[in-house]
């Protein structure tokens, strides 16, 4: 019997409705009790608690105020928690969106530990990010690294895949302080000058 392959469903841009279904708070709608959102770590989660924040810019340098991000990261011990449960002190998966006014996204999490790649080589602490936004038919994959992990960054096999050092800088979040708490700023530029490096994962 011949095998019939199903055609691939075409991708579509995120459109104006992604916030209604996945980012209720950002859309100004009542939130659900069981919501996957931007707080990956509860106060009792082990590790260094940090705030991540940033903005998304298009090729003309304008803020993309309706973008949506999904993140996947290891815990402070470098282990991925693949069983999502809102009762967990820490979950590896989270979501956030840029606000319609300031165009800024935030994540409350812990700084991830070192994870080995498939070959057993340590990768610098990082957070995987998928970006969904208007005009993007297939979401974009990037990574966030930390500027105070210079030694680990210099040895990271993934960062070193990027030949130009100045391009690697587009993946480095800058440490800062927000309301007395440790934070890292990571702005994403979809295209144009200073375009963020995206991966074909």
Curated annotation (Swiss-Prot):
Cofactor: binding comment: Binds Fe(3+) ion per subunit.
Domain of life per record: Bacteria
Cofactors named for this entry: Fe(3+)
Positions bound to 3,4-dihydroxybenzoate: 134
Listed PROSITE patterns: INTRADIOL_DIOXYGENAS (PS00083)
Protein family membership: Belongs to the intradiol ring-cleavage dioxygenase family.
Principal EC category: oxidoreductase
EC nos: 1.13.11.3
GO-annotated molecular function: ferric iron binding; protocatechuate 3,4-dioxygenase activity
CDD domains: 3_4-PCD_alpha (cd03463)
Catalytic activity: 3,4-dihydroxybenzoate + O2 = 3-carboxy-cis,cis-muconate + 2 H(+)
Record InterPro entries: Intradiol_dOase_C, Intradiol_dOase_core, Intradiol_RC_Dioxygenase, Protocat_dOase_a
Gene name of the encoded protein: pcaG
Protein name: Protocatechuate 3,4-dioxygenase alpha chain
The protein's assembly and partners: The enzyme is an oligomer of 12 copies of the alpha and beta chains.
Keywords associated with the record: Aromatic hydrocarbons catabolism, Dioxygenase, Iron, Oxidoreductase
Pathway named in the protein's UniProt entry: Aromatic compound metabolism; beta-ketoadipate pathway; 3-carboxy-cis,cis-muconate from 3,4-dihydroxybenzoate: step 1/1
Pfam families, A to Z: Dioxygenase_C (PF00775)
Protein's job: Plays an essential role in the utilization of numerous aromatic and hydroaromatic compounds via the beta-ketoadipate pathway.
UniProt xrefs under PANTHER family: DIOXYGENASE, PUTATIVE (AFU_ORTHOLOGUE AFUA_2G02910)-RELATED, PROTOCATECHUATE 3,4-DIOXYGENASE ALPHA CHAIN
BP GO terms, sorted: beta-ketoadipate pathway
The species this protein was found in: Pseudomonas putida (Arthrobacter siderocapsulatus)
